[in-house]
Amino acid sequence: QEQVCAGICESVTLSRFENGKQTPSRNRINAILQRLGLPDDRYYALVTPEELEIEALKKEIVSCNALKCVEDGFDKISQLEKIVKPDDQITQQFILRSKVLLGGLDKRYSNDERIQMLVQAIRMTIPNFQLDKIEDFLFTLDEMKLVNQIGNAYSLSGDNEKAADIFYRLLQYIRRHLPETVTSNRMLPLVLYNFARSLDLSQKYEEGAKVARCGKEACIKYGHYQVLHSCLEIEAECDFFLGKKEESVERY
């Protein structure tokens, strides 16, 4: 119970939610369901005008990141910082994670700074988080994204061995805790691709090709095609270095 509600609410508050004595906010119930490995899109909840404003700004920030509109994104973050409550750790975590993503586009943070900021963000809701014990915790979708970002930050710094270990541990967590949930379906292909890429960059071509194939299969199985071409590219490159040139040409 402590792991489920850590950084989200107190244990006694969770009990009140369970007994119907208190109604949770939408972002809190989403986070709790995600940590339990349950779908977060099968219920209805009333939201306040403040919650609607926060959600709208979060969507705009995500859009700015996708469109690489860095300055607009930081302007939206400033607006969000003015209305979010200090004890809303979930939104505070989103803000810090978004700063790292947007800041990565214009290189305003070094790799070390990015790693420090990402670890700080995840410890807002998981105070005892350790990279070598990833499988010991329960994660929300945003927390899984943070772990994924930390792995990418290590890869960008050139430490692909460390990155591969992070992706491996996150992959084990997803497979064990979230076998068929929507949350898992969204994360699985992405983590498999990043894991395969780190193995490829570590010159572990046989393992990299195998993981890339798993990523390709996950994309097709769950209908998430954003990294399908990237998985094919990694598989092709690994095949090339393994001397399988005909297979490599076919993948490309």
Regions found by a protein language model. Name each.
Residues 1-16:
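Short alpha-helical DNA-recognition segment
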Residues 27-42:
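DNA major-groove recognition helix of helix-turn-helix/homeodomain DNA-binding modules
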Residues 52, 91, 135-142, 180-187, ...:
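Structural signature of alpha-solenoid helical repeat junctions
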Residues 55, 59-62, 91-102, 142, ...:
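"A position-specific structural signal for the A-helix of alpha-solenoid helical repeats
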Residues 59, 63-64, 98-105, 153-156, ...:
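Residue-level signature for tetratricopeptide repeat
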Residues 67, 106-108, 157, 195, ...:
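Structural motif corresponding to the intra-repeat A-B loop/turn of tetratricopeptide repeats
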Residues 77-85, 119-132, 168-179, 212-224:
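Amphipathic alpha-helical segments of tetratricopeptide repeats
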